[in-house]
């Protein structure tokens, strides 16, 4: 399985919070961030602020195989609206996926597309209900370049976090004696020295989200409530190895 499709809950929370923050500037927007393995379309990652039921039904039924938006996006490199031409061209106007969409008050939308270097189809779909079509359409048209850049930037963060997860697992396999991976230890060490997440990210040349991801793993490993408890316990039990600056 490709590294992006492990559906790590911590990573999904981080990515969702980044989309929530980035898209909040444009109003009350419902969105779905989707990553599809083009070589193996059953592998799919969906992060959304829409109803969990919608996402669960979509994934359980593998609706990506019949979704007109996905089918259209496979052959596009620029953003596109969900219009009548899309429905006609895919010949799926009465498909199950549109029945599902109507049930969850999704009547229109706009999708931003990215084809990444790992052969994944990456989409950010803005979902629009009937009561807010004109307002959201105007916002999207005025900010298409910014929304496309948002997708590119946050997808790069997704890739970075999953690479760190894989590296973390490899570190654990290579050194079973240490409770923390090399990266976790580095982050915990600098945190114990009073550095903020932003400062640690600069020191280690990684993203702030990556720091938060590893701190989350440390908290789980130690069975404590939060990062402050983890740092204090790491110091008290001498679990943190010195790091050369």
UniProtKB/Swiss-Prot annotation:
Residues annotated as domain HTH luxR-type: 173-238
DNA-binding region location: 197-216
InterPro entries recorded: Sig_transdc_resp-reg_C-effctor, TF_LuxR_autoind-bd_dom, TF_LuxR_autoind-bd_dom_sf, Tscrpt_reg_LuxR_C, WH-like_DNA-bd_sf
CDD domains per record: LuxR_C_like (cd06170)
Coiled-coil zones: none
Keyword Acyltransferase: no
GO molecular function term, any single one: DNA binding
One annotated GO biological process: regulation of DNA-templated transcription
Family per record: Belongs to the autoinducer-regulated transcriptional regulatory protein family.
Protein name: Transcriptional activator protein ExpR
Protein's organism: Pectobacterium parmentieri
Gene name as annotated: expR
């Amino acid at each position: 399985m490709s590294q992006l499709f492990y559906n790590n809950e911590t990573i999904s929370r981080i990515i969702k919070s980044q989309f929530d923050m980035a898209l909040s500037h444009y109003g009350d927007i419902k969105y779905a961030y989707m990553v599809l393995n083009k070589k193996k379309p059953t592998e799919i990652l969906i992060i959304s602020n829409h109803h969990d039921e919608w996402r669960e039904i979509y994934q359980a039924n593998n609706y990506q195989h019949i979704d007109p938006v996905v089918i259209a996006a496979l052959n596009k490199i620029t953003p596109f609206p969900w219009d009548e031409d899309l429905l006609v061209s895919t010949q799926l106007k009465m498909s199950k996926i549109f029945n599902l969409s109507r049930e969850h008050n999704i009547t229109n939308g706009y999708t931003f597309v990215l084809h990444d270097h790992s052969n994944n189809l990456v989409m950010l779909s803005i979902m629009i209900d009937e009561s807010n079509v004109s307002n959201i359409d105007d916002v999207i048209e005025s900010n298409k370049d910014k929304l496309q850049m948002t997708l590119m930037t946050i997808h790069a963060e997704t890739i970075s976090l999953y690479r760190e997860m894989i590296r973390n697992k490899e570190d654990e396999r290579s050194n079973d004696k240490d409770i923390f991976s090399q990266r976790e230890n580095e982050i915990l060490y600098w945190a114990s020295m009073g550095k903020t997440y932003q400062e640690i990210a600069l020191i280690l040349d990684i993203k702030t989200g990556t720091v938060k991801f590893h701190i989350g793993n440390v908290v789980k490993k130690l069975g404590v409530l939060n990062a402050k408890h983890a740092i204090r316990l790491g110091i008290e039990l001498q679990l943190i190895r010195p790091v050369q600056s």
